[in-house]
Amino acid sequence: MSDYEGSGPTEGIDYGHSMVVWPSTGLISGGDVKPGGSSGIAPSMPPGWGDYSPQGIALVQSVLFPGIIRRIILDKELEEGDWSGWSVSVHSPWGNEKVSAARTVLENGLRGGLPEPSRPAAVSFARLEPASGNEQKIIRLMVTQQLEQVTDIPASQLPAAGNNVPVKYRLMDLMQNGTQYMAIIGGIPMTVPVVDAVPVPDRSRPGTNIKDVYSAPVSPNLPDLVLSVGQMNTPVLSNPEIQEEGVIAETGNYVEAGYTMSSNNHDVIVRFPEGSDVSPLYISTVEILDSNGLSQRQEAENKAKDDFRVKKEEAVARAEAEKAKAELFSKAGVNQPPVYTQEMMERANSVMNEQGALVLNNTASSVQLAMTGTGVWTAAGDIAGNISKFFSNALEKVTIPEVSPLLMRISLGALWFHSEEAGAGSDIVPGRNLEAMFSLSAQMLAGQGVVIEPGATSVNLPVRGQLINSNGQLALDLLKTGNESIPAAVPVLNAVRDTATGLDKITLPAVVGAPSRTILVNPVPQPSVPTDTGNHQPVPVTPVHTGTEVKSVEMPVTTITPVSDVGGLRDFIYWRPDAAGTGVEAVYVMLNDPLDSGRFSRKQLDKKYKHAGDFGISDTKKNRETLTKFRDAIEEHLSDKDTVEKGTYRREKGSKVYFNPNTMNVVIIKSNGEFLSGWKINPDADNGRIYLETGEL
């Protein structure tokens, strides 16, 4: 209660004293008397009768000066019908305040940077002694600042009530070594809510307001604060230092703000009604902790600090990992998937489904088989594991030291079975009618002794591969390297991002018999199973090859034969993200032998090269270049306008013979469309004469 309990109601300001009040609702037993009503008596009997003005508001409990901490005490003991409320008088600046000195230290410190870059800096200006622990009292410390002392936002630009305004400084409570402090903080973007002050009705004069008196909410769960502003602009004649109980004024060091700062305080900017000529006021209200509260707060402070340290260390580790990842991806030429628009996705899907497209997806640790215009088959999990074992075994066989260059032919028929129904594409053979591409982890072929590092332009492998058409079936040749015919160096090609589709493009250089080739890579990882995570951002989907049935086998049968020349291989290595997404893995890609495409196979061209001279090929040495010339000469023969279909070849059922009377050359095509042979007809020989007369060759 007030030091003057028992005296009659008075007007005026009691400097340095707290007049504890609790205004009444007037709903008291025995009547319906309103505070300041016509009865002229107090709203209730003691305690508290002398703490009200005739207008029905609490008398001034304390005086607020900018930068001076004031102690406000409210009684929890209420008489029946009493109502809550507290009242202060707001004055012009007072000397001997400590906030300005602390602000100077803070500003000087900020010029050198924040103590902790992610947190505000602080300088304390008061140390708070523990509360007495009187459960019948509500104790708050209150300190104010003029608007321009906390923000550069002018009064005219403050947002509507309930919104926040950016501020440079705030007055907060902190914990340090078990002690509660008041401090000024700054150095990072901060905001404070705006509240509107409203006029207080004069209960002695219904329909009017009390002059220069307003109320505003300044702290949650406590009554609105009544502010008397009549002397706000009145100069103070003297400035003796104001000492509040339990508040020790002292300027602290420049430190990082506490990790539980503002846990026990609330601050607002109070805006007064337009036309009041009262400037907005920053008010911070602080709850003083008792010894038990201090212990709990310090424990929370320590835990928050430890949590922050752990999170910071984790953030630093993540940042370092992201930096290392970015450097690694850049070195390997790997681009992260872009953010796709609907238009980009549609373009990408359209391009990947074009008839001549060869596409790979970015599924990590996968084995893939792609064919032009028919999508990609992807092996992962157990199937990919079995294929890996298969290649490991094959690698052991083909790299026998005492054996010279070897050709290891591995039939993929045991792994992939073409399964179109008869009449619905059963004559279409991958590797003959369709260009095919096979990819796997480069480490499968490199073996344990070879380290593949990002940034290299080529990688030496003990074996290289190519896809071929063998007896109408897709097969894979593994070729031992280490000689002039089969060099060990496999080129590493980097993907180039196409901005229109978001796809990556890898350009395979031209070789003898085949032009340059563009390979498309979808950079978006493909899920192993369909998922619906709620994220419906548009992304392109790699077309899936469905024309092939796949089953897992333990070990396909292999055959090993010497080989003298294979010419230029169509293979390369590129990099993609690994399964974890933090590293990269090298992918080895092989394509068809150019001579194993369409109606031709390298084997058959090699076998029938003895007739190459009949088609104008004078070089008797068989190699990729001469075999390509032989193939092209046969194609030229078939496309010549004077070439006609004439008869069949008696040794090949269902075959067709194409004859050109100008050159006297014939080319035999098997019933399945494959090239069988070709030579020049001698009309003077019996077989030549019979063919010309009967069409039977």
Curated annotation (Swiss-Prot):
Pfam families: Cloacin (PF03515), Colicin_D (PF11429), Pyocin_S (PF06958). Disulfide bonds: none annotated. GO terms for molecular function: RNA nuclease activity. The keyword Phosphoprotein does not apply. Keywords: Antibiotic, Antimicrobial, Bacteriocin, Plasmid, TonB box. GO terms for cellular component: extrachromosomal circular DNA. InterPro entries: Cloacin_colicin (IPR024575), Colicin_D/E5_nuclease (IPR038233), ColicinD_C (IPR024440), ColicinD_C_sf (IPR037178), Pyosin/cloacin_T_dom (IPR016128), Pyosin/cloacin_T_dom_sf (IPR036302). The keyword Oxidoreductase does not apply. GO terms for biological process: defense response to bacterium; killing of cells of another organism. A motif (TonB box) lies at residues 17-24. Gene3D superfamilies: 3.10.450.200. Belongs to the cloacin colicin family. Colicins are polypeptide toxins produced by and active against E.coli and closely related bacteria. Colicin D inhibits protein synthesis. This colicin requires TonB for its uptake. This is Colicin-D. The gene is cda.
